[in-house]
Amino acid sequence: MEQLSDEEIDHGAEEDSDKEDQDLDKMFGAWLGELDKLTQSLDSDKPMEPVKRSPLRQETNMANFSYRFSIYNLNEALNQGETVDLDALMADLCSIEQELSSIGSGNSKRQITETKATQKLPVSRHTLKHGTLKGLSSSSNRIAKPSHASYSLDDVTAQLEQASLSMDEAAQQSVLEDTKPLVTNQHRRTASAGTVSDAEVHSISNSSHSSITSAASSMDSLDIDKVTRPQELDLTHQGQPITEEEQAAKLKAEKIRVALEKIKEAQVKKLVIRVHMSDDSSKTMMVDERQTVRQVLDNLMDKSHCGYSLDWSLVETVSELQMERIFEDHENLVENLLNWTRDSQNKLIFMERIEKYALFKNPQNYLLGKKETAEMADRNKEVLLEECFCGSSVTVPEIEGVLWLKDDGKKSWKKRYFLLRASGIYYVPKGKAKVSRDLVCFLQLDHVNVYYGQDYRNKYKAPTDYCLVLKHPQIQKKSQYIKYLCCDDVRTLHQWVNGIRIAKYGKQLYMNYQEALKRTESAYDWTSLSSSSIKSGSSSSSIPESQSNHSNQSDSGVSDTQPAGHVRSQSIVSSVFSEAWKRGTQLEESSKARMESMNRPYTSLVPPLSPQPKIVTPYTASQPSPPLPPPPPPPPPPPPPPPPPPPPLPSQSAPSAGSAAPMFVKYSTITRLQNASQHSGALFKPPTPPVMQSQSVKPQILVPPNGVVPPPPPPPPPPTPGSAMAQLKPAPCAPSLPQFSAPPPPLKIHQVQHITQVAPPTPPPPPPIPAPLPPQAPPKPLVTIPAPTSTKTVAPVVTQAAPPTPTPPVPPAKKQPAFPASYIPPSPPTPPVPVPPPTLPKQQSFCAKPPPSPLSPVPSVVKQIASQFPPPPTPPAMESQPLKPVPANVAPQSPPAVKAKPKWQPSSIPVPSPDFPPPPPESSLVFPPPPPSPVPAPPPPPPPTASPTPDKSGSPGKKTSKTSSPGGKKPPPTPQRNSSIKSSSGAEHPEPKRPSVDSLVSKFTPPAESGSPSKETLPPPAAPPKPGKLNLSGVNLPGVLQQGCVSAKAPVLSGRGKDSVVEFPSPPSDSDFPPPPPETELPLPPIEIPAVFSGNTSPKVAVVNPQPQQWSKMSVKKAPPPTRPKRNDSTRLTQAEISEQPTMATVVPQVPTSPKSSLSVQPGFLADLNRTLQRKSITRHGSLSSRMSRAEPTATMDDMALPPPPPELLSDQQKAGYGGSHISGYATLRRGPPPAPPKRDQNTKLSRDW
């Protein structure tokens, strides 16, 4: 973190300035000579303009370039600390001014003659000449700048640029107006030479700040309308008449102001720091004293391409004292680093730490003073936080208990009874009672920071390893003023540390948390779009991630199997689709979808929270549910009923649902899920069907009923998310497919086909669903989403259908695969509520929610829907067919609502609902069971997407992509998911967003769903075998949905990134599609964008989905996202993602996808879009995710399990161990060259290699 040597910079500046002084005359002369040549060549009718332009631009650019660096050097030199002498500066400025004016006077004469000669030339030529002059002036500026005072140079540059500009304008004017030209030119020239002109003054003020800008503007001026120019010139002329004295005074005042600003800027302290990453690599960056830790964190997240998460923290490790502290977001980084000693071994580490905001994720564990951890409904958590932080004063938790206090200078510890109060920490002296008058102030918190001690059992013979340290930030060595306390267990440690933080920072902590939440959400909108979307394949992975091992394994297993069969059928479908899309439907629809999705996503975002539970329902409702509206909630469904509108509705409901899901996830997904599953189990089911009908509207209603339930709905979607899962499930899907069958004819040609085929099966599955319902975590299978595998059809279908039939068998497998990946444990638990918790960590709320659902495993949701409306389901399926995917959608939703959740808790996450949509075809099939949903059949436009979207409905396109093409993408997203999960709270948030997108999608997709049912059949067959797994992923997807499904849906879900839903969605879809070029073609137009934005696109995605292979390819393409997963949870990612990847991977690699003609349709456009989005969000996501996943283990520890840094942290070890061997080089100040960044690359690379 050493600062660069100022002397070196100063020398460079001095040399430059000397040369500059000498060269100024030469430069001007040379330029004028050039001008003469130019005019001559212009006279000879050869159009030189085009040729000259590029060189001109290059000149200007070079000038700007050098300008930028010289300014940087000057600032650095000033930075060295010496205060700048204003008088000396002004003297420099004046001397330069004089020099320029003398030079200018000569030049102006020359120029006048030139202008005369040129007057006859056409305007265009003048412009050219004008441009050249400009370039010349800018280059001369460059030189001038360095000369003299650093600031004066700046001003000079600005002046020169302005002058050149004015000269150009004058030249032009001269052409247009014969009489004025001469005068104008003269004036301008003079100005450029050094005389003051109005234009110049302004230019100096602006241009001094950014000569680059002015240069650019001057360049642009060339392109400005020639007619407009003259008028501008006239205005300038009118202004120029001001007397020279006035002008000089103005100019001088302006210069002084600029110089003062620069001086101020130059005196800002800047530090070059080295930040160590959790993967043992490190990054070097410059920070200035005005930057907060939050800003630096945002910077690092961008640079390291890791997914956004609340848990990313900057950790200060004081190796000499073996302690570490997580910097608070509002703190000033430079201030803290300046406390380090010059020879300090301290390190700055960028890593995920769940302890940072665990306080806000589970406030009941920290604010109530209870000894045991407890679950609490999200709403109650919010109320608790508001009571504590939003009142007139902050309520400091009254923590008290026995702690061990270290004796000064000894390695002995004694027990004392300590109490935390707002004013500080107190203790009861030996032999005294706990009476307020006997309390002794241990210390006040104003000037001390709280640190975690590391390995004090060895260092200080502490009774336990749970130590906290209180010291003044400037104490860097051993001191009697450092207080060491030891707790009996990790829970007590975290309670004390967080209590002290609350007492010290108060409301600022809560504000930091909300700010971080906003950033993460907005980032997720983006990433969910690009990376998530891109990673639709990933998304399945992500679900697996949630479930962790199970889902991973099963996923990969399923993926492998399904891919072949599904890939083939999918590729065929995708080809058909791609052709159809190529015909033009794609583009039109995608644009429409995009717009819709954009509008809807936001909508969904808003309602999400409450709707979450409904999300699932909404989907259901969306599909066939219309009839089912029976449930009162359906009222909202009414909107869904209109099949055409449904898509919108879906988006609405979906969005809400999605949003809701996210919320849950964020807060206490597990709790919510559990509650939801329990209450919702029963409640949910009925509502779900109704919801399905109302779908979009109802979703919200659903949520309310369940309150907690919201999370459950998402679970169903998970299946979808696990595109991989879905793929895997395809076989199982077959059974469930029937349900999905409904999927969506909308799917477009290809999807429709799939769905149609599957449709028949659909009916049967529904019954099964009911049976397996509860038991089967398999419900997940419902999610099965194998449909996704199948591409999109299967995923959705599987979701519903699978659960029923395969449910029992599949459940296990499914569970496993389903997104167990990340939360394998949850998977098994899926059925039971417990699962949710496991999932929760990773899967986020969704997972958690599903657990509640567990009562009624995913199947239960689906089953509930199915059982409730088993008969209807079938008919609904038919309806859904007409409606399209909606049914599918619905089904997924409903499972997510509660059932799915339980099983897939992790993946079940409500969000998944949306995921299903991606595999519209399947979802259609699946939804058939929830035929009610079919009703909403979203609008056909989205169908293609819709079908996949069904689940997602809103994000049909996305969904589809998720399932099929998206699937490919999804995989990458999955990593993201992982990261999300890892972040847990952070991730959760994002996920929720996705759900909203999903919701939107689902709205749109429903049509696809209903339509697709029959189509779904095709994929289903393949899926059936893997339904279980797929389902899992599907179910998980919901939870993951946010991750996996979301990925796929991401675009749609982008909702996941709440905002992004709208914004990001559109980009994501692109990225999503691009990944699976072949599929993309089909899905791309519709899905890509629509997916992101709305179900509309979904259809396209759907196309992609159908082809598992595509997914794989996509995955490859999105490999970067995969990388992310790698980071996140290498295992999880690898397993889940890999398995899914095979299926979805295709999607990512566009090239691989190419086979899918569909993608090829818009290869260019989508590819580009995807690429950029991918690059931006995916890479960011990917790396983040991978990183996150790595950290995940820690994060997983839910709450504050974070164990104190391991012994590695010990001073010596720490160096080597913490950051890895490099870390030892962790010095905050960067002494040597910046560390090599290659590792990060891998993230980006992540691609699908693995």
Swiss-Prot record:
Compartments where found: Cell membrane; Cell projection, Lamellipodium; Cell projection, Filopodium; Cytoplasm, Cytoskeleton
Residue stretches of biased makeup (Polar residues): 552-570, 976-986, 1131-1144, 1151-1161
Tissues in which the protein is found: Isoform RMO1-RAPH1 is ubiquitously expressed with highest levels in brain, heart, ovary and developing embryo. Isoform RMO1 is widely expressed with highest levels in liver. Low expression in B-cells.
Residue ranges annotated for the Ras-associating domain, each copy included: 269-355
Phosphotyrosine PTM sites in chain numbering: 426, 456, 1226
Major place of residence: membrane
GO biological process, one term: axon extension
Compositional bias (Basic and acidic residues): 588-597, 1238-1250
SUPFAM superfamilies linked to this entry: PH domain-like (SSF50729), Ubiquitin-like (SSF54236)
Family: Belongs to the MRL family.
Assembly information from the UniProt record: Interacts with EVL and VASP and targets them to the leading edge. Interacts (via Ras associating and PH domains) with RAC1.
Record's protein name: Ras-associated and pleckstrin homology domains-containing protein 1
Organism name: Homo sapiens (Human)
